[in-house]
Curated annotation (Swiss-Prot):
Site (Important for metal ion-dependent interaction with integrin): 140
Disulfide bridge partners, by residue number: 34-170
Species of origin: Mus musculus (Mouse)
Chief site of localization: secreted
Protein's UniProt name: Spondin-2
Gene Ontology molecular function: antigen binding; lipopolysaccharide binding; metal ion binding; signaling receptor binding
UniProt binding sites for a divalent metal cation: 140
Subunit structure: Monomer. Interacts with integrin.
SMART domains for this protein: TSP1
């Protein structure tokens, strides 16, 4: 299930291209309209920055290793919302955030384009098979549909994702030339798992979308819990660049990740997030040993739960002794 976005890549494009022709209607509602020239075309580059250096706690190495799903987005008006912080996600976005299944979300986007006339175009980019790397595509925006939203699932995770909600690429009467944004993890509010590899544990009743921070959820088991940090480093970045060439027919990007290449993030530019050692509680004291009439010794132990990394606090002593009166002395 975790790699379903990789397998659905080509089918996703076929579906998206079929939708584009039917989702270019005018929006409903009375929102202000962008007065920029009729159409603008942008390249969008998504860069994953999810490295073991920046996010050492419980970093997924196997089954599956850290990676990103395909990117799915839409150019739309204010009548449509793909997702929004502090609001409930749709069933389609729930399926995408939990399992990487895009079909229901794509159907919702199609319905918004046909019924609400609020979606101008949809776009997608291939998945990234590692935590660090990049993927890209192109999108077209229209003065009446100048907002852009997208989501990318964090794999593996219970229901965590990154994305953009209703970014306006129009500013007054002009299209923005470039937009660069750092991205941070969000919880879709549909699964209560605390760690990347948590088993499915539905949130009942469903919660709203929340941003995951270094201190929230405030639980040591959470994979993003770093109490020494004021804020998490960005886990991804997205760049929109306006293309100067005249509009042309929409063409999907190459689905060959090898030809595009994955950006390997320079380790010198990645912040080192300190990970402190975590140990268990002490065990019970053992029996007191020693000769009768003299003080003996007893001991207890604890074990390392999380090894320190990136100059985090080192582990304390794992064994402790104390004087005692010998047990069962005759």
């Amino acid at each position: 299930m975790e790699n379903v976005s990789l397998a659905l890549g080509r089918a996703l494009w076929v579906f998206l291209l079929a939708m584009i022709g039917s989702t270019t209607s005018q929006p409903l509602g009375g929102e202000s309209v962008c007065t920029a020239r009729p159409l603008a075309r942008y390249s969008i580059t998504f860069i994953g920055k999810w490295s073991q250096t920046a996010f050492p706690k419980q970093y997924p190495l196997f089954r599956p290793p850290a990676q990103w799903s395909s990117l799915l987005g839409a150019a739309h008006s204010s009548d449509y919302s793909m997702w929004r912080k502090n609001e409930y996600v749709s069933n389609g976005l729930r399926d995408f955030a939990e399992r990487g299944e895009a079909w229901a979300l794509m159907k919702e986007i199609e319905a918004a384009g046909e019924k609400l006339q609020s979606v101008h175009a949809v776009f997608s980019a291939p998945a990234i098979p590692s935590g660090t790397g990049q993927t890209s595509t192109e999108l077209e925006v229209h003065p009446r549909h100048s907002l852009v939203s997208f989501v990318v699932r964090i794999v593996p995770s219970p229901d965590w994702f990154v994305g953009i909600d209703s970014l306006d690429l129009c500013e007054g009467g002009r299209w923005k030339e470039q937009v660069v944004l750092d991205l941070y993890p969000h919880d879709a509010g549909t699964d209560s798992g605390f760690t990347f590899s948590s088993p499915n544990f539905a949130t009942i009743p469903q919660d709203t979308v929340t941003e995951i921070t270094a201190s929230s959820p405030s639980h040591p088991a959470n994979s993003f819990y770093y109490p020494r940090l004021k804020s998490l480093p960005p886990i991804a970045k997205v760049t929109f660049v306006r293309l100067q060439q005249s509009p042309r027919a929409f063409a999907p990007p190459s689905l060959d990740l090898a030809s595009r290449g994955n950006e390997i993030v320079d380790s010198l530019s990645v912040p080192e997030t300190p990970l402190d050692c975590e140990v268990s509680l002490w065990s019970s004291w053992g029996l007191c040993g020693g000769p009768c009439g003299k003080l003996g010794a007893k001991s207890r132990t604890r074990y390392v739960r999380v090894q320190p990394a990136n100059n985090g606090t080192p582990c304390p002593e794992l064994e402790e002794e104390a004087e005692c009166a010998p047990d069962n002395c005759v």
